[in-house]
């Protein structure tokens, strides 16, 4: 990790990059460009992460509600275990704290062992495992009190 940059999504090209990372990391929840844009309209903070000019990940921070924030940090598989996830997580966590978060929630695809291990390493506790109606993929909700 040499030149980490976290950049707020602004404009179509950045949104498409965010969507690309999201869809690679979470294929069962792959979304269209329009669906990604809806997240911005809902007030979600979307950011892309670069090592220099190379896209390595993205993040989502939902608005804080009643002291609870949902944040998700995603790193492309070929860039994992290099410190990008840790740096991104610290970045979004700092933002969430400034927004008044007292509790952090995240959601990880059940087969994403790297993501589950990462969340547990940072103190997240599993809250629930579930499969959405009409789907077959298992999701894991995790929570951390700040």
Give residue ranges: language-model regions:
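Glycine-rich phosphate/pyrophosphate-binding loop shared by adenosine-nucleotide-utilizing enzymes
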Residues: 2-4, 52-58, 69
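Active-site rim helix/loop that mediates acceptor-substrate recognition in acyltransferases
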Residues: 22-60
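Short coil/loop residues immediately preceding or within conserved phosphate-binding loops
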Residues: 43-44, 56, 66, 70, ...
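A short, internal acetyl-CoA/4′-phosphopantetheine-binding micro-motif in the GNAT/acyltransferase core
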Residues: 72-81, 108-109
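Conserved acetyl-CoA-binding loop-helix of GNAT-fold acetyltransferases
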Residues: 81-94, 98, 117-121
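Conserved GNAT acetyl-CoA-binding A-motif
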Residues: 96-110
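Conserved catalytic-core motifs of GNAT/GCN5-like acyltransferases
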Residues: 107-109, 120-141
């Amino acid at each position: 990790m040499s030149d980490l940059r976290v950049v707020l999504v602004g404009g179509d090209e950045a949104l498409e990059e965010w969507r690309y990372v999201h869809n690679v990391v979470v294929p069962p929840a792959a979304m269209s460009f329009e669906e990604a844009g809806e997240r911005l309209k809902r007030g979600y903070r979307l950011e892309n992460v670069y090592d220099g000019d190379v896209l390595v990940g993205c993040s989502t921070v939902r608005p804080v509600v009643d002291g609870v924030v949902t944040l998700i940090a995603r790193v492309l598989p070929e860039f994992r275990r290099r410190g990008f996830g840790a740096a991104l997580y610290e970045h979004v966590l700092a933002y969430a704290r400034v927004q008044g978060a007292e509790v952090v929630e995240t959601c990880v695809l059940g087969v994403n062992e790297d993501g589950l291990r990462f969340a547990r390493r940072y103190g997240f506790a599993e809250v629930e495992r579930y499969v959405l109606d009409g789907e077959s993929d298992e999701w894991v909700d995790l929570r951390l009190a700040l």
